[in-house]
């Protein structure tokens, strides 16, 4: 004689109650063969529900052994027990335990999702089962739109979704009227006739009459185990015939789960054991789409989630916007610095700024400018010497800074012209009495609208013709109020200042040449020419680097503030997910009962948290672009600059926020005991 399908040997189940343990099952020995229809009868508190939970691998014995098809369940881990529930057991609960937020088809598909069944296959099977149970026209109704009998039939169909070799029915008619109860009993008979093993747990002896075998339990002990002499009579009462069986429940055992060989319908013959849990390949992980989408639809705290998402939105908007503002400010500052001549190196007499001997050093001469201009790393070089002198035009007298410069000065400094042209090399050689003035000088001498080009002005009583006016410069460092006039340095030396030496030399380094290396080379050249180092250099590249470092530091500081808001949003995600786990405890129990593994539950809640954060991140990035558009309207000088790196970083941050702050709630959900979870309201 072959071994029974389900076998309990000396099973005891205790539960802690304060300092003592309460014995719910005591030394239970029970064997159930494949294809049997068995009723476990007992009063409330007799231990029958605990026995059913152990039979369905929802609970485990404190002592003794429970084998399914010869396999000791004590030796199985949580995933293997989930595989047993998923592929070989189907549960029919008194309270139906259907997910209220999805329709009948989606409720049926749930076990098949965890079994890894393709979407088209599970959808077709769900509709087929509903049709065979008379619910074809209720396929897209939610549980709240179905009667009690219809909900119980959906529960039965769900139990059959993956084959349902063993159907465990806990008070299947307890919440139904007489007619609906008879319909459920008839369906169970039909399933048994097709080879399903049926275990009915009930306190109602009228329901127990429909089993071939009645097992009575009292105070955790089996007090009777006898065949039912009235089975044929009860069988006839519900009107189960061959035609009805074929019409209503044919092929209900054809399940997607592999290794599920149907046992013979003859329950007097011992059945083949159920396939071992490792006989079938492990079900693939639930797709993130189903894990997150189904879960997000089930959340009853939509408003709370929106508020939680608001924290993520604010955090991501802050991070992206601050980075964009910082990048825009940095570029604007560099452009402003560029307007005064970037990539330039200036040489001054003396050892450093404030050198008291600098006025006595007269070694910087025009020949040095010519030597520097010939170097391969130099784009241009210009001398400079300056004094504050009196300017006069007609009856207007003003003091201005008069600078004697070379013809390449304006190129070296990156200056642009509003009117006229700069002087050329010929003017420098001829000591031409020409001048270039800035906008401030123009306004003082000629007014804001008059064109001064071609007019003669007196520079310290030396007449000079204005040939150009530089463009006005609006600097990030403030508007320039000084008056400036530029004349050829030969004119300044010979006609105005009476000196042959230079105050400074400015060198523009060629593009692509390292500024630091160029600085060292020109220092070496000048030391060779002068025989000693009687000058010092000022590299504008150091200013650029300082501005860049300052901008980066400021951006980092502001980003840290934004990250704090992102962390606050992440804590909000964790809080709402913890609340969600508490509110959806029964749903978690249902999912575990139909075969969800701990990793499936963990993934579901983790994906939900990530989806919330990703959605918040997407909205935050969109808001950042909107703020950028508004910013450009109200701040015309510079714009927020969005980079792909900042956007990618924002998405990564939102994803990591979901993973980090969603992990603990997801782990708590995955570690719930299915029995405790199902017992929650």
Curated annotation (Swiss-Prot):
The keyword Transmembrane applies. Homodimer. One of its GO terms (biological process) is response to antibiotic. The keyword Translocase applies. It is found in: Cell inner membrane. PROSITE patterns: ABC_TRANSPORTER_1 (PS00211), ABC_TRANSPORTER_2 (PS50893), MACB (PS51267). Its main location: membrane. Residues 274-285 have a biased composition (Pro residues). One of its GO terms (molecular function) is transmembrane transporter activity. InterPro entries: AAA+_ATPase, ABC3_permease_C, ABC_transporter-like_ATP-bd, ABC_transporter-like_CS, MacB-like_ATP-bd, MacB_PCD, Macrolide_Exporter_MacB, P-loop_NTPase. Keywords: Antibiotic resistance, ATP-binding, Cell inner membrane, Cell membrane, Membrane, Nucleotide-binding, Translocase, Transmembrane, Transmembrane helix, Transport. Residues 246-298 are annotated as: Disordered. Non-canonical ABC transporter that contains transmembrane domains (TMD), which form a pore in the inner membrane, and an ATP-binding domain (NBD), which is responsible for energy generation. Confers resistance against macrolides. Its EC number is 7.6.2.-. The chain crosses the membrane at residues 306-326, 554-574, 611-631, 644-664. The lineage of its organism: Bacteria, Pseudomonadati, Pseudomonadota, Betaproteobacteria, Burkholderiales. It comes from the Bacteria. ATP binds at residues 42-49. GO terms for cellular component: plasma membrane. It is an enzyme of class 7 (translocase). Residues 246-273 have a biased composition (Low complexity). Residues 6-244 form the ABC transporter domain. Belongs to the ABC transporter superfamily. Macrolide exporter (TC 3.A.1.122) family. It comes from Burkholderia orbicola (strain AU 1054). This is Macrolide export ATP-binding/permease protein MacB. The gene is macB. It is a multi-pass membrane protein.
């Amino acid at each position: 004689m072959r071994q029974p399908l389900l076998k309990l040997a000396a099973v005891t189940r205790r539960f802690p109650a304060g300092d003592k343990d309460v014995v719910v099952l005591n030394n239970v020995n029970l064997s159930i063969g494949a294809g049997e229809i068995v009723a476990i009868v007992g009063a409330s508190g007799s231990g029958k529900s605990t026995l059913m939970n152990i039979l369905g691998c929802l609970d485990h014995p404190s002592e003794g052994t429970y084998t399914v098809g010869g396999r000791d369940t004590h030796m199985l881990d949580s995933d293997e027990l989930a595989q047993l529930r998923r592929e070989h057991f189907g549960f029919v609960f008194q309270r139906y335990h259907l997910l209220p937020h999805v329709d009948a088809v989606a409720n049926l598909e749930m076990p098949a999702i965890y079994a890894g069944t393709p979407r088209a296959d599970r959808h077709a099977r769900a509709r087929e089962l509903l049709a065979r149970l008379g619910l074809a026209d209720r396929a897209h109704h939610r549980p709240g739109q179905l009667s009690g009998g219809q909900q119980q039939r959906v529960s039965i169909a769900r139990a059959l979704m993956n084959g349902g070799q063993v159907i465990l029915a806990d008070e299947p008619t307890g919440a139904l009227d007489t007619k609906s109860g008879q319909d459920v009993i008839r369906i169970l008979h039909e399933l048994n006739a097709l080879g399903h093993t049926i275990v009915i747990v009930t306190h109602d002896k009228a329901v127990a009459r429909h089993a071939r075998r009645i097992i009575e339990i009292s105070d955790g002990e089996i007090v009777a185990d006898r065949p039912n002499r009235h089975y044929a009579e009860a069988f006839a009462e519900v009107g189960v015939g061959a035609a009805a069986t074929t019409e209503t429940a044919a092929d209900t055992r054809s399940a997607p789960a592999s290794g599920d060989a149907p046992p013979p319908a003859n329950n007097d013959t011992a059945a083949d054991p159920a396939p071992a849990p490792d006989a079938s390949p492990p079900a693939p992980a639930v797709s993130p789409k189903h894990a997150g989408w189904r879960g997000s639809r089930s959340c009853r705290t939509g408003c709370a989630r929106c508020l939680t998402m608001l924290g993520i939105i604010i955090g991501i908007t802050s991070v992206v916007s601050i980075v964009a503002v910082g990048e825009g400010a940095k570029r604007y500052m560099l452009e402003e610095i560029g307007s005064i001549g970037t990539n330039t190196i200036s040489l001054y007499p003396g050892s450093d700024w404030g050198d008291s001997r600098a006025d006595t050093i007269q070694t910087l001469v025009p020949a040095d400018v010519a030597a520097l201009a010939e170097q391969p790393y130099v784009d241009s070089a210009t001398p400079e010497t300056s004094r504050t002198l009196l300017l006069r035009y007609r009856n207007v007298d003003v003091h201005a800074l008069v600078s004697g410069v070379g013809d390449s000065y304006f190129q070296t400094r990156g200056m642009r012209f509003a009117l006229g042209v700069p002087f050329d090399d010929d003017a420098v050689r001829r000591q031409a009495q020409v001048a270039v003035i800035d906008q401030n000088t123009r306004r003082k001498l000629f007014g804001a609208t008059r064109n001064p080009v071609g007019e003669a002005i007196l520079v310290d009583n030396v007449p000079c013709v204005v040939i150009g006016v530089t463009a006005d410069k609006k600097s990030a460092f403030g508007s320039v109020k000084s008056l400036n006039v530029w004349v050829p340095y030969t004119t300044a030396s010979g006609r105005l200042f009476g000196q042959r030496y230079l105050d400074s030399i400015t060198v523009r380094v060629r593009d692509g040449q390292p500024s630091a290396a160029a600085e060292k080379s020109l220092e070496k050249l000048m030391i060779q020419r002068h025989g000693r180092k009687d000058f010092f250099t000022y590299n504008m590249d150091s200013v650029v680097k300082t501005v860049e470092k300052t901008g980066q530091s400021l951006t980092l500081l502001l980003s840290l503030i934004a990250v704090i808001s992102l962390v606050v949003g992440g804590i909000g995600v964790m809080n709402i997910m913890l609340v969600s786990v508490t509110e959806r405890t029964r749903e978690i129990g249902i999912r575990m009962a139909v075969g969800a593994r701990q990793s499936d539950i963990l993934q579901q809640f983790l994906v939900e948290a990530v989806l919330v954060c990703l959605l918040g991140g997407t909205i935050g990035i969109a808001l950042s672009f909107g703020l950028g558009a508004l910013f450009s309207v109200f701040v015309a000088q510079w714009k927020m600059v969005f980079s792909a790196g900042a956007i990618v970083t924002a998405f990564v941050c939102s994803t990591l926020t979901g993973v980090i702050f969603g992990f603990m709630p997801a782990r708590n959900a995955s570690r719930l005991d299915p029995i405790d979870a199902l017992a929650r309201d």
